[in-house]
C-alpha cells in the first residue's frame, strides 16, 4: 500500500476481531510480511473454498449451459476488477474494494437469487435467508481460518474495514426492508464491525462495490444475451419496442419512470459502439464490436460515477465515510435499462421460469431430506453446530447453512440420493 493510502486508514479500520500471532513457518532471517492488512484480507478471500464454489453457481443461466457461461465466480472477478479501478480513481484502498467485489456474492446459494428465494421460504419464520447476510456469516463464522480464545470460529477474521466494505445493507432484518445484511445471531460481530459508523449508511468502499456490481451484471448479462441470440440491441432504436421495454423497467425498478427509460434507450441507441453491434452473427468482426461495446459501457458507467463524486467531494483520497458515491441519474437509468433487457428477454422467458420453479422444488426437497436425517445427513462442521443448537430455529439455520454452501452439482447429487422424512 502506498504511504498516502496507508495513512488514510487507521488502526481502528485495520483491527481484527481476534488478535493473531505472527506467522511462524518462515525460514530464519526472512521477513514474514510485506503486504498491507487489506492485501492479506484479499488473499484470504481469494483462497477460500466458499469463493471457489461460486464457479458452480448460477449467474443468469446455469454454469453448465453454453460454451462460455458466466458464473457467480466470473461475475465476482469482474466486479472486483471494476471496483478496483474505481477505487484507484477515488483514493480508496484498491485491495479493500477488490476483496469486497470478490466477496459480494460469496453467500449465494445454488441457483443464485432463485435459490435465495427458496431458502427464504423455508426459514422465513426463523429470520429468513438473504445472500448479503449469508456473505457476512461466511466471512465471520462459517469459512474456517481462525478460532477465538474459546475455540469458536471467527471465520476469515478480516479487518473491520474489510467486513464493512462487503456490507451493502448494514442492518439486520427489518419490517418494510426486503434486503438486510446481518442475521440476528450474527449481530455481535456486526456491532463490532459497525461501531461508530453512521446508522444504516454503507461505507464508500461498499458503495463502490455495489455500483461495480450493477455495472458488471447490467453490461455482461446483455453481452451474454446478445451472444445467445436472445437480445437484439436494435430494439433500443425502435420507438415502440423501447416504450414497451421502459414500461417493464419502470414496474421492476419503481424509482424510475417510463420516460426516464425511454430517454435512456434513445441515448444508448445513439452511442456508436451500440449501433455498431447491429444484428450479432458470431463473426470475428461482430465479436470484436460486442467486446468493444462491453468495455466502453463499463468505462462510461464507472467514470460517470467517479467524475460526479469528485465534483461533490473534491480532490484527495476518499475513504470510509468521507463521501457518498454519486451516480448521475441519467447513467443510473441507462444501467436499469440494460438490466431490463435481460429481465425481459432472458429471465421472463417461460422456459427459464419453469427451470427456476424446478430448482426451487429441488431445494425444498433437499432441505426436507437433510432435516429429517440430521445430524447424520450433515457435513461434520454442520453436524457439530446442529448438535449444539439450542432450538429448532437454530437447527434449521444450520441445515440452511449447509444447503447454501452446496455447489449446484452437489445439490443435484444430494437430491437424487435423498430419502426424505416429514418434518415433525
Swiss-Prot record:
Keywords for this protein: Hydrolase
Record-linked InterPro entries: dGTPase, dGTPase-like, dNTPase_2, HD/PDEase_dom, HD_domain, PHydrolase_assoc_dom
Domain HD: 72-218
GO biological process, one term: dGTP catabolic process
Gene3D superfamilies: Hypothetical protein af1432
GO molecular function terms noted in the UniProt entry: dGTPase activity
Family label: Belongs to the dGTPase family. Type 2 subfamily.
Protein name per its UniProtKB record: Deoxyguanosinetriphosphate triphosphohydrolase-like protein
Lineage: Bacteria, Bacillati, Actinomycetota, Actinomycetes, Mycobacteriales
Amino acid at each position: 500500500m502506498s504511504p498516502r493510502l496507508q495513512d488514510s486508514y487507521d488502526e481502528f479500520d485495520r483491527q481484527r476481531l481476534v488478535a493473531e500471532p505472527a506467522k511462524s513457518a518462515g525460514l530464519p532471517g526472512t521477513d514474514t510480511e510485506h503486504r498491507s492488512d487489506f492485501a492479506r484480507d484479499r488473499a484470504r478471500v481469494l483462497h477460500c473454498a466458499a469463493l471457489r464454489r461460486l464457479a458452480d453457481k448460477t449467474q443468469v443461466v446455469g454454469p453448465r449451459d453454453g460454451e462460455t457461461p458466466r458464473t457467480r465466480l466470473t461475475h465476482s472477478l469482474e466486479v472486483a476488477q471494476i471496483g478496483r479501478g474505481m477505487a484507484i480513481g477515488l483514493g480508496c484502498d484498491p485491495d479493500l474494494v477488490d476483496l469486497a467485489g470478490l466477496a459480494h456474492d460469496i453467500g449465494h446459494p445454488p441457483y443464485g437469487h432463485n435459490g435465495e428465494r427458496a431458502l427464504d421460504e423455508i426459514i422465513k419464520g426463523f429470520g429468513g435467508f438473504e445472500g448479503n447476510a449469508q456473505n457476512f456469516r461466511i466471512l465471520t463464522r462459517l469459512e474456517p481460518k481462525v478460532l477465538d480464545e474459546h475455540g469458536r470460529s471467527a471465520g476469515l477474521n478480516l479487518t473491520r474495514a474489510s467486513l464493512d466494505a462487503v456490507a451493502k445493507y448494514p442492518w439486520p432484518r427489518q419490517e418494510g426492508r426486503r434486503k438486510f445484511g446481518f442475521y440476528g445471531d450474527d449481530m455481535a460481530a456486526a456491532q463490532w464491525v459497525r461501531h461508530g459508523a453512521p446508522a444504516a449508511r454503507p461505507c464508500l468502499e461498499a458503495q463502490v462495490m455495489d455500483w461495480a456490481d450493477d455495472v458488471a451484471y447490467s453490461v455482461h448479462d446483455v453481452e451474454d444475451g446478445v451472444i445467445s441470440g436472445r437480445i437484439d440491441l436494435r430494439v433500443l432504436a425502435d420507438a415502440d419496442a423501447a416504450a414497451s421495454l421502459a414500461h417493464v423497467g419502470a414496474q421492476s425498478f419503481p424509482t424510475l419512470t417510463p420516460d426516464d427509460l425511454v430517454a435512456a434507450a434513445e441515448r444508448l441507441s445513439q452511442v456508436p459502439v451500440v449501433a455498431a453491434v447491429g444484428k450479432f452473427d458470431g463473426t470475428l468482426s461482430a465479436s470484436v464490436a460486442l467486446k468493444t461495446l462491453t468495455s466502453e459501457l463499463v468505462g462510461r458507467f464507472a467514470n460517470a460515477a467517479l467524475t460526479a463524486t469528485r465534483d461533490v467531494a473534491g480532490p484527495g483520497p476518499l475513504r470510509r465515510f468521507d463521501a457518498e458515491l454519486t451516480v448521475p441519474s441519467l447513467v443510473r437509468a441507462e444501467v436499469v435499462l440494460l438490466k431490463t433487457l435481460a429481465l425481459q428477454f432472458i429471465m421472463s422467458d417461460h422456459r427459464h421460469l419453469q427451470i427456476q420453479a424446478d430448482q426451487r422444488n429441488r431445494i425444498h426437497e433437499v432441505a426436507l431430506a437433510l432435516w429429517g436425517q440430521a445430524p447424520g445427513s450433515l457435513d461434520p462442521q454442520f453436524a457439530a453446530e446442529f448438535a449444539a443448537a439450542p432450538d429448532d430455529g437454530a437447527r434449521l439455520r444450520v441445515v440452511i447453512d449447509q444447503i447454501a454452501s452446496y455447489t449446484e452439482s452437489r445439490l443435484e447429487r444430494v437430491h437424487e440420493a435423498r430419502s426424505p422424512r416429514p418434518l415433525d
